[in-house]
Amino acid sequence: MKTTEKNVKKDTKKKVKVIKVRTVRMSEDKPESVNKEIIDNPVAEEKVPERKPEVSKTEEKKILENKLDKTKKAMKRTEDIGAVGEDELNELIKDEDVVIDDANNMFINKKTGTLVKYIGTTSAIIIPDSITTIGRYAFRGNETLKKIILPDSVKRIEKFAFCHCFALEEIVFSNNLESIGENAFLKCQRLKELNFPPSLKAIGKGAFGRCSSVEKLLLPAYLQKISDLSFFSCRRLRKIVISGSVESIGFSAFSECYNLKKVIISNSVAVIGESAFSWCRSLEEITVPSTVKTVSNWAFYGCQNLTDLKISYHTRDIKEDAFCGCENLFNVHIIEFDNEDVSMDEIKKGRKQVIKILKQVNRKRAESYAREYGISTLFI
């Protein structure tokens, strides 16, 4: 199937703004009966589906509150787990291989090269070269630490390692860092910059949740997955560049990033997870690349300022309410358009106006359709 494009002058007499017209040449591999039916009956494909009853404002508000509550409960569970970590930490300190490094105010497991616990009160520290792992809960709740430098010997940061370090403003990562554990930097509210090394391959669930001062995020080249809640409620985050190895974006990964305006998604992503970008109220446009096969439930829920969506016809699996609450989403561009049906049902949900992708209809009929449904911009 091949398509040709014609530019159409704006019709000043009509209120409908027709941006682009595509004419479709029928594919030779289509059954003759199908081609004949469309040729003989050119209006067959312009049937307007029955409009589904709109959800009331009260019902929509209740749905939104339920989704938000689900995300907050998930985050609360991770914080509760961190709160009971002291007992586990005490057991680690009792290990016979753990010694006290008085010079650096640390408990260190010499056998594994793990920094088990930091007990100092300085505002800036450099981790010794002998350390390969920052242990779980090692700096949890430290109230004085503002800056930390990790040597290139460090390959792992375990779960809750720096969570609730409310004074932490800067961390220099090891150039050989491979993984960051669950909730490792949870609620480090003054942490401003995240300069990840190229070696980083895994970021755990909730790792940077509620790091509310981070403004820009460039994810490393070899990261394969953005885990659930990884950057949840990073409220000053404005820009995200998702690198070329990421295959999936997890549940609520960027939910409640209220100031997020720009997201660049690489051509490696196949799944945008449930609530992944929900409540990103400042997001104005998004391009879903052709590699994405699934846009999950509530993926862009409540993105109230989203006006432009570019999405490939290859993206066939758009889940329930994926774009619900995007009440200003008026312009939908279908990339790599062909003669196959493109379901718009989930994109239309919860919006004040309907954008419909029409095929094989003339301009006059398209304008008539647009006037009937109050469409300000129509792509055909």
Task: Write out the residue ranges for each language-model feature.
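Hydrophobic residues embedded in beta-strands of well-ordered beta-sheets
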Residues: 113-115
